[in-house]
Amino acid sequence: EKKDEYLSKSSASAAPVIDTLAHGYGKVLGKGRLPEVPVIVKARFVSKLAEEKSESLVVLSN
């Protein structure tokens, strides 16, 4: 609910940042669903499935 509310209020030029490292995760496997807006993800590893599944995903790795 909060995610849908956030996405409806956000502008098209601002992309949300998901910091997986701050929450103790370093991998993005692509098993969930992503919104249609561009997303910036901070992660150490991104699987091929996640890359194929998301065209508008920007990954920042350490």
UniProtKB/Swiss-Prot annotation:
Family matches, as Pfam families: Ribosomal_L27A
MF-aspect GO terms: RNA binding; structural constituent of ribosome
Keywords: Ribonucleoprotein, Ribosomal protein
SUPFAM superfamilies: Ribosomal proteins L15p and L18e (SSF52080)
GO cellular component: cytosolic large ribosomal subunit; nucleus
InterPro entries in the record: Ribosomal_uL15/eL18 (IPR021131), Ribosomal_uL15/eL18_sf (IPR036227)
Signal peptide limits: none
Keyword Ribonucleoprotein on entry: yes
Domain of life: Eukaryota
Similarity remark: Belongs to the universal ribosomal protein uL15 family.
Protein name per UniProt: Large ribosomal subunit protein uL15
